[in-house]
Amino acid sequence: MFNLEQLHIAIIGLGYVGLPLAVEFGKKVPVIGFDIHQKRIDELNNGQDHTLEVSKAEIQQAVKLRYTSTLEDLKDCNFFIVTVPTPIDDFKQPDLTPLIKASTSIGQVLKKGDIVVYESTVYPGATEEVCIPVLEKVSGLNFNQDFFAGYSPERINPGDKLHRVTNILKITSGSTPEVADYVDEVYNLIIEAGTHKAPSIKVAEAAKVIENTQRDVNIALINELALIFNKLNIDTEDVLKAAGTKWNFLPFRPGLVGGHCIGVDPYYLTHKAQSIGLHPEIILAARRLNDRMGEYVATQLIKEMVKQRIQVVGARILVMGLSFKENCPDIRNTKIVDFIKALKEYDLDLDIYDPWVDENEVQHEYGLAPIKKLENGLYDAIVIAVAHNQFKTMSAQEFQALGKEKYVLYDLKYILDKTESDLRL
């Protein structure tokens, strides 16, 4: 029934997750990469990737891959992989709109014998409770009779050149035992690290959502410890280094938890828990604490400026870094923006410098205009917010030179020695 020789893959969504997947599969089997944005299709046809996840050489190696924004081009595909975003709304509830729209599109070209695999992070049950009914309604086909489904959660780490799609172990699952075997077989075409076949779609969904929830809770604990140690006038990094000498102490650091995964996924799990009458305590407490860190960091900076007799109103602040993590242009759900918003309440001037981000995207998403280059002697405070390689290679003297005669240097990322900055998280 399912034959690798007849495999024709469609990747729905060509962002940070979909493109690397499409490129790897495109080296082996016929693949069509579909994206609703024609600008993205044109960019990829020119061998360019603004996310910087895939190089031009890698794109050129995918000789069996072509790109389209035309749904009709997918009618000959028989294995659909959905990699669209799953954000939250303003009320921190799951926004499944992209997933529903993708399912609606696939339903229009779905045929008997086709398989639809979802990679987008969701709560346990979402694939079968939300996506499958859409596919059935639009296609007129019956689930597990005419078409089938699978779930294989993405584990892409944007900006990470060491952990790539092929060398990260992949969880797979299917709606029947036979489909699960076939989905696993398909992914093993490209996943060198191997696969783990989960016993059900719900198990695979749950596994993904707790991966990031666990990280979020652990970082929240360290953030809370940082708040305590700051009050006690103890350097947090010194404490973590000392505690880290024990073999089973987990190596987490305090910070602003943003991005499309860690700061979002826990809300998918808590939404599902609340829908069945459970109220998660630890997960939501961790989220609240991590969401407040931007405001806390801003307050700490203002306090230090006041302590050093630096005029706050009208002060000029430099924020170095805007992306949600180092060496990556991704600005989705970056918590640096929360920090910036909190600072703006003090009626001061802000410059943002980040050599990785796209200026137009920043302007469109947040209404901010990053500066293009650094100038010395301009700032009342300098904040190292993201540990880009460009910043890590700068000396303490280079950071200090950016300040006026009197200034505050706040190192959020432990780039400098503790003696070389005024504040650390």
Task: Name what the model sees in each region.
Residues 1-425:
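Structural/interface elements that position substrates and couple domains in central-metabolism enzymes
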